[in-house]
Amino acid sequence: MITVVYFWQIKKVFLPIAILFMAFHKFALMRLPGVSFVKLLGTGKGESFTPKDANPYRWGALITIKETHLDNLDDSKVIRGWNKIAKQEYRAILKPVSVHGLWSGKQPFDVEKLDWNGKIAAITRARIVWRKNVVFWKAVPPVTISLHQSHGLINAIGIGEAPIGLQGTFSLWESASHLREFAYKGQAHTQAIKATEENKWYSEELFSRF
């Protein structure tokens, strides 16, 4: 199994169509051969994780699928439909090397033992306890500033299944060591981990590397 991530920067005139796609395409994707997990995603700058951070003209999809069915996915009506309304497209084919936690009650990624020393992608996501959203938002800025200033970061964006309460990041790194430096040695992030444990912000969370 592999994980495929798509992001589309759409033309503004097609925003109503994109919203319709978000409402109905998950079911169409789940019916495709070889697909075991689907999430349609909104995106943002990844600076505040509040609704004002959202970018209504950039959307994404994350799909776990058997590698032999990848061509069928790329040629599906869903993916071709998004490509038609997009002015920019991005696709990454990912092989999971580690995952901790759950996503919608599932472990969605088929982890492989790989001897890999190249670039790394990371996906983090969490379901925030509803009554703790405001406290969480106040705590986020130092972490996001630290993330975007991190040595070895190639790019990072915010991702989410909903504007409030279901938040995450997709980031690309030059190496696993750069990612570990941010995650476990950066002061802002380690303080956020401690605060998460103390305040129990999340009802569910996941951290994965590819």
Task: Place the predicted regions along the sequence by residue.
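Short S/T/G/P-rich N-terminal loop/turn motif that feeds into the first structured element of a domain
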Residues: 1-58, 67-73, 84-168, 177-185, ...
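Signature tryptophan residues that serve as conserved aromatic anchors
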Residues: 64-65, 173
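Alpha-helix boundary/capping residues
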Residues: 76-78, 186, 196
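A common structural junction motif
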Residues: 77-87, 189-191
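Extended hydrophobic/aromatic segments used for targeting, binding, or gating
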Residues: 181, 188-204
